[in-house]
Amino acid sequence: MMWYGQIGFIQSEEDLDRSALLMTLAMNGDAFKQWESIYVVTSFFAGTSDDLTYYEYLPAIEAAYGGVPEVSALIGNTDGWNTFRSLTAAMDPPAINSIPTMDDGDSDTKTTDANKGFRFMGQRFTIDEAIFQQLVYDNVQADASGNQRMLPDTLDVAAALGSDTAYSILEQQGDTGYAGYTENMETLRTNISQASDTLWTSSLYSNWLHTLTPLLEEKGEGYPSFMRSSQWAKKDLETFAGRYAELKHDTVLYAKQVMAEMGGGELPQWDDRGYVEPEVEVWTRFSNLATKTAEGLKSYGLLSEEDETNLNRLAQMADQFKTMSEKELSNTLLTDDEYDLIRNYGGNLEHF
């Protein structure tokens, strides 16, 4: 899948654009149905393609040739070919640059030329990678020492999603010293804060980011004093970064990981009652995410009975943690059953 997403038929190279036309024609019909059955499900998980695909190229072919032509009809049809070339040249380039390019003084043009083109199963657009794109060279320029910002930082995402704590750390690290960084960050924060719900519900990946964003919000009146401290804000930022790292991992690697068994002897008798981080909105969104995941997979006919049961259990657990969070915020003592759920949380997760 990675190979299909990265190997492109670059529009600026005529032979490759011709290959893209032929591949699109080859995909038409039954082959398209098979391709789409893979594409729509992976889009449900990770989002739609950032690159040009069959969806963009087939309409261009129809417009240039007056319909879907036979391959034999392409030979000698110079007018159709020239029209097709002009239509593909006018298509939007990808929002995210995934191709290393040399800086020769005309980097904008070169990057666009090296990236824009047809891909069989294009890599997916994600909000966080779009954030990164705007905060590295050459969208930001050198700092006072002449250094370029060649790599992004996880804190870029947190700051763009609204975390003042993350932005403060970036300032301390010197990241805001790169020319254009502050301006680009402000633009990103404004655009994201004004984004519609459609952006966050477009895929499970986007929905996960939306689920985590309450961790980045400043806790005001109504929260316990310890949750309104700068230390708690940093702890929440670390929680966000940890789950974000797992989210990135989940979208590129699907190998099973070895786990330790729960148990192994009697525990000493101590007061081991735990607590739930009182993030009511996070638990609410997590419950909704589990429910929507089950509904989406079921609609594609890809949800086994066991997986449906597990997703329903996840949603139920999130609802229970939401209830506990509300109790903690109102200084209401948890029940023994609720303390038991916290105590055995890891063991419950182990069996999903």
PLM segments and residue spans:
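Long, non-catalytic protein-protein interaction scaffolds
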Residues: 2-352
